[in-house]
A protein has these predicted regions:
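Amphipathic alpha-helical/coiled-coil segments positioned at domain termini
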Residues: 1-32, 38-40, 124-174, 200-247
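Hydrophobic, Leu/Ile/Phe/Ala-enriched alpha-helical segments that form helix-helix packing faces
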Residues: 110, 148, 190-197, 246
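Helix-rich alpha-solenoid scaffolding regions
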Residues: 175-199
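Generic hydrophobic, helix-prone segments enriched in Leu/Val/Ile
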Residues: 43, 80-90, 143, 164, ...
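Alpha-helix boundary/N-cap detector
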Residues: 72, 76, 97-101, 159, ...
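Amphipathic, alpha-helical segments enriched in basic
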Residues: 85, 112-119, 123, 139, ...
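Hydrophobic core segments within long, regular secondary-structure runs in both alpha-
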Residues: 103-111, 162-165, 186-191
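Domain-level detector for long, ordered catalytic/regulatory cores in large eukaryotic signaling
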Residues: 1-134, 148, 153, 244
Length: 247
């Protein structure tokens, strides 16, 4: 088997005490770092002083400040990890970068595909990845990527990509029974992806977004729903209206 400063500045700091390592002007989380999960009780008791400046007022209202704040699937996975994978393949370190001919082959295969009308966008070239939207990254992860990459990239890279693809597919499943049946498998796949991506792309790949994947299944379990139901995606098109109201 392919095995908020009251809260914290991000979900990851509210979910674990793992300390990253600074390298190449970024904080990375290697497989050698020690990981200890945060919990609601210790957060309410102000036991994470390195991440808390005071006891959150939310605690007074019995709001659980770790489990009740979900990771956002759209920014974490689509615009985070998947985008990072493609940028590493296109402009990353030499050991993991795809050749121009490989990029061209994948792009040509993408162009040859015609997606049904249920998809918001048709496929675009990897040479245009800087302008891809969140929906395009999802389509690549779940549908087109597994097809166009299979005979182009090496087996290890493909298995690593597929681990993420299958895990996310499970966590997006709308049927509660089917999702619950395979959630442990998705958890194992994400752990495999995080470890394997360090090997495939190098230590600098495993930044906050990548490491946070190991906590993604917790939101499925806590909220008892698909990641689609707790994603910021549905609100994205209304941000301009909110900006106009607060000017």
């Amino acid at each position: 088997m392919v095995e908020p400063r009251l809260l914290s500045y991000d979900k990851m700091l509210t979910t674990n005490t793992r300390v990253g390592t600074r390298k190449d002007h970024r904080i990375i989380f290697t497989s050698h770092d020690v990981h200890v999960a945060h919990n609601d009780d210790n957060f309410a008791k102000f036991k994470y002083e390195e991440h808390q400046t005071m006891v959150s007022p939310l605690v007074k209202y019995n709001i659980t400040c770790v489990s009740s704040f979900s990771l956002d699937y759209m920014h974490l996975v689509r615009l985070g990890v998947v985008r990072r994978i493609l940028f590493f393949w296109k402009t990353g370190p030499h050991h993991c970068r795809l050749s121009h001919s490989q990029l061209t082959e994948v792009s040509e295969l993408l162009h040859a595909l015609t997606l049904p009308q249920e998809f918001a966008c048709q496929t675009r070239s990897l040479f245009e990845v800087e302008w891809w939207k969140a929906t395009e990254f999802q389509s690549f992860l779940l549908y087109t990527g597994p097809v166009v990459l299979k005979k182009v990239i090496c087996k290890k890279s493909y298995e690593t990509f597929m681990a993420l693809s299958i895990a996310v597919g499970i966590m997006l499943e709308a049927n509660a029974e089917e999702r619950a049946a395979y959630l442990d498998y998705a958890k194992n796949l994400l752990s495999y992806f995080v470890c394997s991506s360090e090997e495939v792309f190098g230590e600098t790949f495993v930044v906050y977004n990548v490491h946070s994947l190991v906590h993604l299944h917790e939101d499925n379990e806590h909220f008892q729903c698909s990641l689609n139901e707790i994603s910021a995606f549905k609100f994205e098109n209304h941000l301009q209206q909110i900006k106009q109201l607060v000017r």
